[in-house]
Amino acid sequence: MALQDILSVSDLNRYIKLVLEKEPHLQDIWVRGEISNFTHHSSGHMYFTLKDKQSRIKVVMFASYNRFLRFLPKDGAKAIVRGSISAYERDGAYQFYAKEMQPDGLGSLYLAFEQLKEKLAQEGLFAAERKRMLPRFPKRVGVVTSPTGAAIRDICTTIRRRYPQAEIVLSPAVVQGADAPASIVSAIRIMNDQPDIDVLIVGRGGGSIEELWAFNDENVARAIATSLIPVISAVGHETDVTIADFVADVRAATPTAAAELAVPHYLEWVERVRQLEIRMHRAVRGTMTEQRNRLTRLGNSYAMRQPERRLEEAAERLDRAHLRMRQSMKHLLDRRRERYTRLDEQIKRYRLADQIGEKRKNLSKLRATLDERMLGRLNQKRMAFAARIATLEALSPLKVMQRGFSLVYTNDRLVKSVEQFAPGDEIMVRLSDGSATARVEKVNREEEKQSGSQKNGTRD
């Protein structure tokens, strides 16, 4: 045995892996079995064992594939898995690498149904507050279903019989099989792009659970939930319940029932219009009777018996209102006029600023001239005043008394004549340096010409 024929463990495992991956019968195959030892790792990858009564195989399903699963795998569930066989080099063990997985059998379908139902319910897609009201008088009714099935015939017949003026717009879709979910989603989106679609019917006729399974698809449910048009689900018969029924705004037991919910019956509305007409006539008659009675009461009232007086009162109120309006206008105009006057004065002051400056200069010159002239005039007056003071001082009685003369008073009055007193009267003689009191003993008049008497009086 040559040394070059000896393989390492790694080389051997790598070769086994290469052989397995090149074998066409081990690639892209379906395997049925029961799930056990299921683990959903934090990385998102799934690890489990697929077994039957005689054997088992380890299975790996990476997160990039298992995120598309329509159900949550668990131990004991039967499943059909699509994938390929390969080897894990480190352990030298072959295992099945899954790319797709579906529940196997009706029990698994029911499990997938319940799991999706719970998931969407937790997201609030079934909440009553999300449900929208259907339009009462739709003009265009959209339908998503098979163009060749009985459902479209039942819907068209019912709508044309009940409400012939409504237009039916069909968006054809595959309603069963592997291609059905994508086809239904596409048809719903196409219908949402159409103008003026008032209500949308999504459904099909009856069938087995497998045939109806497209309406339990998560993508279909989300397309219905996000539709801008109110949706009526109509899948199968009354006993058939799908995820689409929970998500739709209204659930109909059959396609025929969906058509009846979508449009009103014209005879029902004819009867309703007739009833409304009767009610309207009654209301009009009642209103007319009430207004007629009111008119009669008004005609019999005091005010209507003397309309001239009412007109006079109204005219008086009008005159008063007119007077108040004129007064208000006058007051307003006065205020505006006063304001404009103030503004005009302010403007004038601003315009006269330069003139005021010029006048101020002229005034300064005039003040200087006036001061000069007044000073000259004041000097003249001062000199004249001094001359008059000198004259007055020369003529002053005090000056005369300083030369030896005196003033005689009787009863506080200056004596100018001997006729003012008689012998025995008390007199006061005022001299330049004081005064003296004397008594008259004798009065000599000038005409008596007595010698030795003094000219203006006799001394005591």
UniProtKB/Swiss-Prot annotation:
Skewed-composition ranges (Basic and acidic residues): 439-450
GO molecular function, one term: exodeoxyribonuclease VII activity
Keywords: Cytoplasm, Exonuclease, Hydrolase, Nuclease
GO biological process: DNA catabolic process
GO cellular component, one term: exodeoxyribonuclease VII complex
Region of interest (Disordered), residue spans: 438-460
Family annotation (InterPro entries): Exonuc_VII_L, Exonuc_VII_lsu_C, OB-fold_nuc-bd_dom
Catalytic activity: Exonucleolytic cleavage in either 5'- to 3'- or 3'- to 5'-direction to yield nucleoside 5'-phosphates
Subcellular location: Cytoplasm
Bias type Polar residues, positions: 451-460
Enzyme class, UniProt record, top EC level: hydrolase
EC identifiers of the protein: 3.1.11.6
Function: Bidirectionally degrades single-stranded DNA into large acid-insoluble oligonucleotides, which are then degraded further into small acid-soluble oligonucleotides.
Record family assignment: Belongs to the XseA family.
Quaternary structure (record): Heterooligomer composed of large and small subunits.
Protein name (record): Exodeoxyribonuclease 7 large subunit
